[in-house]
Amino acid sequence: MSLVEHFDATLSADPNTRTKAELSLKQLEKEPSFVLAVLQLLSSQEISLPTQQAAVIYLKNRVSRSWSSIDDAPSPLDIPEEQKALFRQNILPVLLQSPMSTRSHLMAILNIILSTDFPEYWPGFSEYTSNLVHSTERCEVYAGLICFHELAKVYRWRLDDRQRDIGPLVAALFPTILQLGQGLINLEDNDSAEMLRLILKTFKSVIALELPPELLANDMILSWIQLLLAVVQKPLPESLMSLEPEVRQSHVWHKCKKWAYYSLNRIFTRYGEPSSLVGDSANKYRAFAKNFITNVVPNILETYIQQTILWTQGQLWLSPRVLYFLGCFYEECVKPKSTWALLKPHLQLLIGSFVFPQLCMSEEDEELWELDPVEFIHKYIDIYDDFNSADVAASRFLVKLASKRKKYTFMGILSFASDILNQYAASPPNEKNPRQKEGALRMVAAVSNSILSKNSPVAGMMQDFLVAHVMPEFTSPVGYLRSRACEMINRFSEIDWSDKSQLLNAYQAVLNCLQDNDLPVRIQAALALQPLMRHLEVHDVMTAHVPIIMQNLLFLANEVDIDALSSCMEEFVSSFSHELTPFASQLAKQLRNTFVKLMQETMDESTTVDDFDSLVDDKSIAAIGILNTLSTMILSLENTVDVLREIEAILLPMINFVLDNNIFDVYAELFEIIDGCTFASKEISPIMWGVYEKLQKVLKESGIEFVEEATPALSNFITYGGKEFASRPDYIAVMVDIIMQVFNSEHLAVNDRVSACKLTELLMLNYRGLLDQYVPAFIEVAGNLLLVTEKPTSQTYRVFLLEVIINALYYNPSMSLGVLEMHQWTLPFFALWFENIPSFTRVHDKKLSLVAILSVISLGAQQVAVAIQDSWGNIMKVMITLLNTLPEALAARAELEKEYDGETFNLSGSGWNDGIDWEADDDEGVDDFAVEYGGPDLGGEISADVVDDFDEFEHFQGNYLLDEDPLFHTLLDQVDPFSLFQEFMVHLKDNSPVTLQDLVKNLEASEQQSLQRLVTEKPSTLAVASDKT
């Protein structure tokens, strides 16, 4: 069977024939010259189009998999270098003569090769491209544009080597393709449009991250802008207007317009607005930006306004994508003074005739509501699915006007919407326009943040507004008005309801909509319940309806996948945990089934299980929300062991499903569930021990990158699994294996090693006497990182590594000192430890250091003094410092524990808009030239040479891992350090007075006073009063 016959057979209707052909191809593809043979097949003009398509798709997948090997391990599918060289020589001629149906795939193949081979293995590609572009043959010019476009795409997001690798080509070809584009725009045929499209997309890729110097030189960029404006203004061919809108959008002339709009917007937002330029960009583009916003933006805005006017008059068709770009540009013009001055005269047109129509339901929207309500939800309710839509851009423009130019626009926006609503209310039933009312309500919802802000002049009117214009629509025969009514209550639920009966009426209306016939209405009702439940009056009434509401939420979760619904369920479970406890098992079973259904559907949609970990879609996001809801429910059941055991059994198949299928996307949330089950019951059940065995296997084989997320669960196994750990050395060995794998890995981050430090510490604290064979290795790995290889500058990382060795000293001081001495680390370790005492801020840190010091001294003062030499004289100073600072740490921890124990949701608290002040924003706008020197320094630069990856995190976020954690408990909680210290001092006084004298001889007067207080006052008194001396 020939190669052509093989690809013919893959298209057969007979599954056996297809399977046989595919298996045969898998054998053939191991031949070194196979990819070249398929490429040569594509050069034949005699092969049918379907066969060519089957062959080119196969070839694209084969090149994608095997052109660049991921690792050094040889594979039968590797393409030999000599075959690659021949393939590079032949692909461009094949591409040149290929039909459109296969050309896009060949372009993708070219892109894959360029991304790995240029310029090192294909140095002649630039010259070849240049020769094609400068050819007098139109087909060769077209091929050159393809080559240039693919190369520009490869370097679109690369900055490091861009100027070196393609800078000369940009300098050589941009004047040529600009001139070519200026000629093509005057033509009407589709081939010319295709060439112009490639030119515009090449320009788009080149300016994605920077404006090349070649464009800024001699103002070439201005000539390009003129070309882009000409494309924007060019009428589409008359023949297009007879086509359906969806077909028009895919036409090549429309694509030219789309990329012209895109590039004009990109230049303005990234390089042309002076006040938004910071750092290096300000230095590079300041001069260009000043000229651009003064002399170019007015022309762009005038062109955009002209296009908008023609669209509003029905004289011009604009696609949703073009409307999106227009909305984005207008939004960017609101803040700068100069562009605001140009935009202001057109506000009535833009608000009334551009924004408002896009916010109204269209005939297509109503059809979508009826025929595909799930898709309607994703488009208009779960808006992150369609964040780049025209109506969302129009809404954002409205929001920017209301927030940044509110004194000029806000009341006008509300007046416009109010007029529409009043007209609707006054019209007889047969003349009411529900689309316009829904659009007006959507306008009001869009500016809700400004309406609800502090000192807002209209916030106090919103109850009457809702009663007049929203409440009646809960019984409207028009489904999308009922949906919008729910959404309006959601947006404005936090107003000050002076009439609580109206609040309860709103709740009842929303609750009724939870049973609505239309799915979008039920979804909006569910989402509206979330803010309503925060009102005490509603919360109390809702208690009676908890089971039925939860049941409805679960039904909805099975019908549609949106993240907001998961958030609603999570808060509902948290707020009504007591009422839901009797139904916890049933709820867990339903949530489990919904989760597994979503995951199974997602796995079925992906081409292979291997692709699953990178697949993020609506279903996986919704599944994550379900896991979060389960976690919340589990924690609400703390100490109800019987119920927790039932839930563990229910969730076990789900846990196994995720771990068995390596569903990395949900590992973090799954580990939280395991953490919750083990923490809430404070013991480890047989079911969870089975999970422990599977968890360690998963971490070892494929998931060690998730050790940080798994650490809380692993910590619980150590803390609450004492009996099993003590009787099962293999359980301890498994934990140690995980720890050492993290420490020895070269690709894990510092925060992962901090997690390993935490697990090491818990083992040594909980299993004294059972870890003798492992402790020397713990000391060696931590000491090597701390004192030899890394010497971390990160405070957090350094403290956790220090505490591994400090724990070892407490565990077995003699053994640990021996290991330190063997490596000659004793002196530097103690010096580093005592030097970093101020960083030991938590109660646990201070107790640990104190008990470790006392354990070391117990070995024999003279022996220890010789071993640590200079640090010996500081031991008493360190202990006094630890004890003096401990009361403050104890008080801080007690306060955190009090907050945690009494933690409830603030049902009567004010809303999240409290932080937004009506008077806060500067309605004068931003001066166009406000940023002259790159903006402020946000804390100084971080040197990559001296700062590790954790330092950068600390630089911006602080040492949060060293903050007190009220949920962190160890056996040291039972230690009274003040009593322990007093007993130690009595023992020294009675048995080693010389050692005592040696320890206190270097104390300052203030330190002696502190010591006197520490040994004479009651421990209970010391624990609550800090040293005043």
Curated annotation (Swiss-Prot):
Designated name of the protein: Probable importin c550.11
Residue runs in coiled coils: none
Natural source organism: Schizosaccharomyces pombe (strain 972 / ATCC 24843)
Record key words, sorted: Cytoplasm, Nucleus, Protein transport, Transport
UniProt cross-references to SMART domains, sorted A to Z: IBN_N
HEAT repeats: 506-544
GO molecular function: nuclear export signal receptor activity; nuclear import signal receptor activity; small GTPase binding
Gene3D superfamilies in the record: Leucine-rich Repeat Variant
